[in-house]
C-alpha cells in the first residue's frame, strides 16, 4: 500500500483549492444537466463559501492535504463532520482528489483510507459521499473500498439539452 498522510491545508493551499474546486464542481454540475453554464463558477464559489464561512478554519470541517512518504503533495480532501442532510453519526466527504500527475498509482485508495481514519478519529461512525454517474473511476474506487449505494438520482432528458436560462434543470423545447 502506498504511504499517504494528511494534514490541514494552509491558507494559501486553501485559496488555490477553492478556485480549482469551484471550476471543477461547476463543470460537473453543468455536465450532469443540473446547472447552466452562465454563472456556474460563481454559484459554486458561493455554495462553498456558505459551507466554509471561516475558510480553512471553519469548525467541524476537515480540509486536508494528502502527502506522500517523500513529503510531496498527492491530493486533497474535504470532510464535513456534520452531515448536510442530518444523518446521525455520519460525516460527509464533499471532495477528494488525487493530483492529476499522480493518478493511477494507488494514491486514491491510500488517500481515501487516511481520510476515513481522520473522520473516524473526529467522531464519525460512517462516511457518506456523492459521486457523479459518469465518474466511473470514482465509483469503482468507492465500491471496492466498501461503499454502498444508499440513494440514487437518475435523469432522462425529455426535450433536448438543458437551456441557458435561470431555471435549474429546465430543457429547451
Describe the predicted segments one by one.
Residues 99-101, 105, 133-134:
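Active-site acidic-Proline motif in GNAT/NAT acetyltransferases
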Residues 109-113, 121, 133-151, 156, ...:
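Conserved active-site alpha-helix within GNAT-family acetyltransferase domains
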Residues 88, 106, 137:
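Residues that form or flank phosphate/diphosphate-binding pockets in enzymes
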Residues 105, 121-125:
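Short coil/turn segments at alpha/beta junctions that flank glycine-rich nucleotide-binding fingerprints
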Residues 93-96, 127-131:
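Conserved hydrophobic beta-strand within the GNAT/NAT acetyltransferase core sheet
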Residues 3-5:
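Extreme N-terminal starter segment of soluble prokaryotic enzymes
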Residues 8-99, 114, 118, 149-160, ...:
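Acetyl-CoA-dependent GNAT
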